[in-house]
Amino acid sequence: MCCGVLLWLTVYYRKKNAKKFRHGAEYGTARWGGPKDIAPFINADFSQNLLLTDTERLTLGQIADPEKRNVNLNVLVLGGSGSGKTRYHIKPNLLQMNASYVCSDPKGTVVEEVGQVLIKKGHYKLKILNTIDFSASMHYNPFHYLHSETDILSLVTVIMANTQSKEKGGDDFWQQATALLLQALIAYIYYEAPEEEKNFAMLLDMLNACECREGDENFKSPVDLLFDKLAKREPDHFAVKQYTKFRQAAGKTLKSILISCSAALAPFDIQEVRDMMAYDEMELEKLGDEKIALFCIVSDVDPTFNFLSAMLYSQMFNVLCDRALKVYHGRLPVHVTCLFDEFANQKIPNWEHLVSVIRSRNISAHIVLQTYSQLKGMYKDNAETIAGCCSTMLFLGGKEESSLKMVST
């Protein structure tokens, strides 16, 4: 009997202190995923998927497995020139016709190839912003999407981010002073001008009417008189407060600020651009309500007018996020897929924050780049944050070092 008890204690002790070994897995268990791994993310209805490869796709609906629902639909696409980013990713996803689309279209070839299919087969409304041939563009008026002082600040931020020199140093003062003047003028137009004058043509006319004289501190330009009149009526008016801050500079400095501001807005002063921005046809607020395909045709050679698409994207996200919360209590009824081909062509301010929150509003973004270094060059330290907000990365090939490191880690 004693031998039996001793044997039992020996077996019990060994089991209690036994180490768990996974034989054959001494160097890790990482492996390539297979059909069973991707299956929970795929919708049985092929048309309700986001396409990645011939065998991999993601459902636009809710993932069946609750433990896997932390996956978002943001995609980072990396591929060198000629790797098929447009042919094998942008176009196939457009032809799924399962969402509203916002598609950047360098050279304007994508809308030519899929536009009629979207209209006839998907019953889409087509919207086109053409910054290569303004006469072929629909009208876009940023003033149409201003509803508050915050919107005014956001509009000025995107203008400054895409029209000012990227050099550092003494530029900060001039940028801040230029921003104050733009905020004051835009606020005055938004709150005080009649509806037909709420556009960039009026902003340019007011800027051209601004004047200061170095030897005469008491000189009043027509714009000064407008703000003086408004200050007497509403001293706490947002436009008055911003203009007062701008006017605190000395005469010579004011003149330099006016020159800086005029230089920043010079691309708007072309008659074709003035005409295109006279009124609005884009209906950005409806992208999440019904099926609309918006194509932004931008030059991949001359970046002069790329700020127009950046301005539109920035306002679109603000409008859609507000509408999702205020009208639909969280999520838009129609998914909005943003296909940003050649994403480095323009800069969207605060993008590192926007890309992290749009998922909850039923919006997704496909950030398409030739190299990862393009993202780092544009967004600096925020590049990793932006990449981290994309649950999926699609690599189509390339030799650039930062892209290869991104894929291998």
Model-derived segments and their meaning:
Residues 1-83, 87-90, 135:
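Basic- and hydrophobic-enriched, low-structure N-terminal and domain-boundary segments
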